[in-house]
Amino acid sequence: MKRICIAIAALPLLAGAGQPQWRADSRPDADDLRKEIAATPEKSGGIYFAYPVTADDEVTVPEGFEPVFLTHYGRHGSRWCLKDYQYAMADSVFAFLQRTGNLTPLGLDVQQRLLRIGQHAKGHAGELSPLGERQHKAIASRMAARVPSLFADSTRVEARSSQVPRCIMSMAAFTERLKEINPSLKVQRHATPGDMEFIAYDSPDAYTIGSRDAPWRRMERQMRDSLIDPTRLLASLMVNPAGATDSLITAVASTYSSKKAPGKEKKDAPRLNGRQMQQQLMKVLHDIAVDIQDVDGLEDVTLLDLFTPEECFNLWQMLNLDMYYRHANAEGNGQAGMNSARHMLQRLIAVADTALAQPGKPDVPVQLHFGHDTHLIRLLALMEVEGCSRSEGNPARYCEAWQDFRVSPMAANLQVVFFRNPQGRVLTLLRHNEQNVSLPIPNAKEGAPFYEWTALRKYLVSKL
């Protein structure tokens, strides 16, 4: 029996020493999640959670089997906040409140923190951070060490990326590390419009379910009103929160109208009343707070201290609700997001078929794909990877069924590794965030955690 074992050094990230809490294979209750997020409030950022440190699972490969092919889908690594207006909105609101004398001492202090954060982020919205590059280099190192024969000599590696720069930079960091390990590798990189049909495909139904006017948004608003109470936070920041409502609406509207991107239509400000605008400000402050973990140079700055543990938990619930309903397997969503992943699943099957049809070592033993959180979430749900596809119909329990920070933190990934013996039998190993995972396929296991490829392929084709 052969063992593939990777020891991962402890790094100063956020998962917590010795806590494999990122795993998606168990269903915690709400109280457990409250405690988990209170212990690590960075997790309240959901998909903003930085790739966690884990001990890689040890794998014992059955005797006589050798690695023959590997394919993967990886989310881009840690980045700055997605949109400039997130920083601009906070700056605009606090500048107005400061001019009108409506900031408490804490509010004035927070304004200075926001100015520093905004200056740090200027020109970088949505961009891969240096931490994001390091995440992908580390994953590449572990991958190459796990199956070194696939990265030996002048092996050909093909890498394909979404056309979005943070994905291209993630691909560059990953493949650069592979070349550092073995300069003889022949690496081909692609970021072309045609590849977007599988790397980042959005069906018409997926667009519809994501619209502001989609019917499920009423449920979302009801949940927000029941969970998000900005009263305490705003009272800590403003001398007269009630008197600031009109200024909030004006400041936010002006932020949207001033952020027209070249060549794009102006984004309309959301139609929100005073209470909703207060909730929006709370959300934006939280968005900025949780993104600090994803960048270098702000280690001595925090905004998470502004929120109570319960506020962090509730803000996370709303982020999680949105991702779960639009992209995973929530009851009533018509599986619109999941079905968009069929193109990527078809791609994974096709590249495996091509590689395995060749005797001996394939022409391209490694096929890498770099894309986005939503598309990985959809793929994992479509495949029914453990912990990633539970169906729940009660919005109050979405958080128990599915947790975005487990399923798709920054740099999340799915790896599929194929092993073949001299008789031509093929076994398959699936890894989610570098941990062994299972699929609901009866009688397909050769022995945990391996699947017979013939049974696995039949199962995957049934999802198309």
List where the protein language model places each region.
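Signature for phosphate-centric chemistry
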Residues: 20-156, 162-367, 371-464
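Bacterial Sec-dependent N-terminal signal peptides
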Residues: 1-24
